[in-house]
UniProtKB/Swiss-Prot annotation:
Name of this protein: Regulatory protein E2
Family designation: Belongs to the papillomaviridae E2 protein family.
GO molecular function: DNA binding; DNA-binding transcription factor activity; nucleotide binding
Region annotation DNA-binding domain: where it falls in the sequence: 331-414
Keyword Lipid metabolism: no
Function: Plays a role in the initiation of viral DNA replication. A dimer of E2 interacts with a dimer of E1 in order to improve specificity of E1 DNA binding activity. Once the complex recognizes and binds DNA at specific sites, the E2 dimer is removed from DNA. E2 also regulates viral transcription through binding to the E2RE response element (5'-ACCNNNNNNGGT-3') present in multiple copies in the regulatory regions of the viral genome. Activates or represses transcription depending on E2RE's position with regards to proximal promoter elements including the TATA-box.
Keywords: Activator, DNA replication, DNA-binding, Early protein, Host nucleus, Phosphoprotein, Repressor, Transcription, Transcription regulation
Length: 414
C-alpha cells in the first residue's frame, strides 16, 4: 500500500509540475499523456486490490480507469506521429493537445485558433447558436503524413479545404435547423459579415435598371447612407443590389412637376456628393461623426489597451447583448478561491483539462505574506473571466471542491 501511494504521489507531482510550467513543447505534451496513462494504471490496480482512496483522490471504477488509459495511449501515439512531421517545431499547449479538442469536429484532428460563428434561426436573436471555426486543422492521412488545412464558413456550414480543393463540412447548419428552426431559415454572422441566402428580384432588368452581383456575404453594418453619397454621374444601388441611373429618376421627377400654367418647373440643382461638401456620408456632421465612431450596431468595442480600465462596476443599463458584453469588457470579473493548497492545485488541473472554455485564466495558489495581515491563513487562487456570463457558466458547470470558499469580485485590469 505504501509503495503504491508513493508511486501515485510521484506521478501527481510530475503532473503538477507540467501544469505549473505551462510550456508549449510537444515533448512535454507527450510526457503529460504518458503520465496520465501511468496514473490510470495505478487507479486500475488500486481498485482491483479493493483500495477506494489514494491520498485525497477517490479511486474510480476499473472501467473508467481502463477507458481513460486507452485514451491516453491513443493521444500518445498521435502525438508521437505528429512529432515526426514538419509541424513538430510549432508551439503545442495542453488545451491544443487535449482529448476533448482532439475528438471535437472534425474528429481525430488537432486544432488551433478557434473562432466563434453565430447562427440565428428564424430571425430570432434569442434562438441563436454558437459554433467554433478552427482556423488551423492538422490531420494525418493513411500514409502517416500530416497535413495542415484551413477552415471557412458559408451559408451551408463550416468546412475545411483539403489538398485537392474540396470542401469538407464538419458543421452543417441545415442539420441543426431541423432541431432549432420552425421556418427553416437561418442567418450566419462571422467577422462583421452576415451570410444570408441569395435574394432574387422579381423586377426584370431594363435599359436603365441592371442587376447587381449577388453575394451571400455582405458587411453587417452597411448603411443606406453609402448609397446616397454616390456622385451625380454614377449609378445608385438600392437595397436589393439593383442599380438605377440617376438621370432616369430625375427625368421622371421633372415630368411630374408642372406649374398650373402647364409649363415645366425649373430643374433642381444637381446633387452634390457628400465628399465635396466635407460632410461624412449619410447626413449632417455631428450625427455622421457619431455613427462612424459607434457604428450602426451600438457603442464601439474597447481597444486592447482599454480593456480593464474602468474604475467602477459595469453599467447595468446597456441595451442589447453586444452593448452588455462591451460594457463588461472593461472590468474583468474574478473569483477568489480559498482552501488547501493541494485541493486548489488539483482543482486547477481538473478544471483546465475538462472545462477550459468556462474561464479566461487561472492563477497559481498563493498566500498573504505580510506579517501585519489579520486575514486567516490559507492558500488562495484567482480565476478570471471574460464577462459575468462566463463566470455564471463556470459556477453552474464546475463543482467547487468541499472545503473551498468562493468569493466574487472584479479588477480594473489583469
Amino acid at each position: 500500500m505504501e509503495t503504491l501511494q508513493a508511486r501515485f504521489d510521484a506521478v501527481q507531482e510530475q503532473l503538477l509540475e507540467i501544469y505549473e510550467q505551462d510550456t508549449s513543447s510537444l515533448d512535454v505534451q507527450i510526457t503529460y499523456w504518458t503520465l496520465i496513462r501511468h496514473e490510470q494504471a495505478l487507479y486500475y490496480y488500486a481498485r482491483r486490490q479493493g483500495i477506494l482512496r489514494l491520498g485525497i483522490y477517490q479511486v474510480p471504477p476499473t472501467g473508467v480507469s481502463e477507458k481513460k488509459a486507452k485514451d491516453a495511449i491513443k493521444m500518445t501515439l498521435f502525438l508521437k506521429s505528429l512529432q515526426k512531421s514538419e509541424f513538430a517545431a510549432q508551439p503545442w499547449s495542453l488545451p491544443e493537445t487535449s482529448l476533448e479538442r482532439f475528438l471535437a469536429a472534425p474528429e481525430n484532428t488537432f486544432k488551433k485558433r478557434g473562432q466563434h460563428v453565430t447562427v440565428i434561426y428564424d430571425k430570432d436573436s434569442m434562438n441563436a447558436m454558437e459554433y467554433t471555426l478552427w482556423t488551423e486543422i492538422y490531420a494525418v492521412d493513411d500514409n502517416d503524413q500530416w497535413h495542415k488545412y484551413t477552415s471557412g464558413v458559408d451559408y451551408d456550414g463550416i468546412y475545411f479545404t483539403d489538398a485537392q480543393g474540396n470542401k469538407n463540412y464538419y458543421v452543417s447548419f441545415a442539420d441543426d435547423a431541423a432541431l432549432y428552426s420552425k421556418l427553416g431559415h437561418w442567418e450566419v454572422q462571422y467577422e462583421n459579415q452576415v451570410l444570408s441566402p441569395p435574394v432574387t428580384s422579381s423586377l426584370p432588368p431594363g435599359p436603365n435598371r441592371r442587376r447587381g452581383p449577388q453575394t451571400r456575404g455582405h458587411p453587417r453594418h452597411k448603411s443606406a447612407s453609402f448609397r446616397r453619397s454616390a456622385s451625380s454621374g454614377s449609378d445608385t444601388r438600392d437595397s436589393r443590389g439593383r442599380s438605377r441611373s440617376p438621370s432616369s429618376s430625375r427625368s421622371r421627377s421633372r415630368s411630374r412637376s408642372r406649374s398650373p400654367s402647364g409649363s415645366h418647373s425649373r430643374p433642381r440643382a444637381p446633387h452634390v456628393p457628400d465628399q465635396e461638401t466635407g460632410r461624412p456620408p449619410g447626413g449632417g456632421g455631428r450625427r455622421g461623426s457619431r455613427d462612424q465612431q459607434q457604428g450602426p450596431g451600438g457603442p464601439a468595442p474597447p481597444s486592447p489597451g482599454e480593456v480593464g480600465t474602468r474604475s467602477g462596476p459595469p453599467e447595468t443599463k446597456a441595451k442589447g447583448r453586444l452593448a452588455e458584453l462591451i460594457s463588461a469588457a472593461y472590468d474583468p470579473p474574478v473569483l477568489l478561491l480559498q482552501g488547501c493548497a493541494n485541493t486548489l492545485k488539483s482543482f486547477r488541473r481538473r478544471t483546465t483539462q475538462s472545462y477550459p472554455h468556462t474561464f479566461l485564466c487561472m492563477s497559481t495558489s498563493w498566500t498573504w505574506a505580510s506579517k501585519t495581515c489579520t486575514v486567516k491563513s490559507g492558500h488562495r487562487m484567482l480565476v478570471a473571466f471574460v464577462n459575468s456570463e462566463q463566470r455564471t457558466l463556470f459556477l453552474a458547470t464546475v463543482k467547487i471542491p468541499k472545503g473551498v470558499t468562493c468569493l466574487k469580485g472584479s479588477f480594473d485590469g489583469l
